[in-house]
Amino acid sequence: MSNDYPLVSIIIPTYNSSDYITETLTKLEKQTYPNFEIVIVNDGSKDNTSNVLREYGLTHSRLIIINKENGGVSSARNTGIRKAQGQFICFMDDDDEIDPNYLLKMYTRQHETGGDAIYCGLYGHYIKDGVTYSPINTEFNEGSLLFDFFYKKVRFHIG
């Protein structure tokens, strides 16, 4: 079945994520899309991230682990791109959580439109002192995406 779907490379730069990276990867493994690899780039972590990733990788064949000197998130993403084998590339952060149908929906949309880049809305939250905050909630709008692109409207740090 997975041969019917092109390989998607999910690139995750990480730094000092030993406390939560296993949870991120475990949730990511629940994707309904059958053909993906996870390229995780450990960007010179000073904590136990390298050992946590190595242990996780022993039982998860989708995981490709790259350890490099710290160079920042953009350098880590570029390293991941160079190692990726997929026809499509998807970026995530090391603390992101995505819907189990995310890759399948993105692939379906790309297949329907033939688009070179596929974009979706974003919802984010964080927990501080036991209170959940939801500061990010953007719905996808094709018209505003084009506007944002041409006016270089950047909503988030991208490297």
Language-model regions, residue ranges each:
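Nucleotide-sugar donor-binding/catalytic module of glycosyltransferases
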Residues: M1-G159
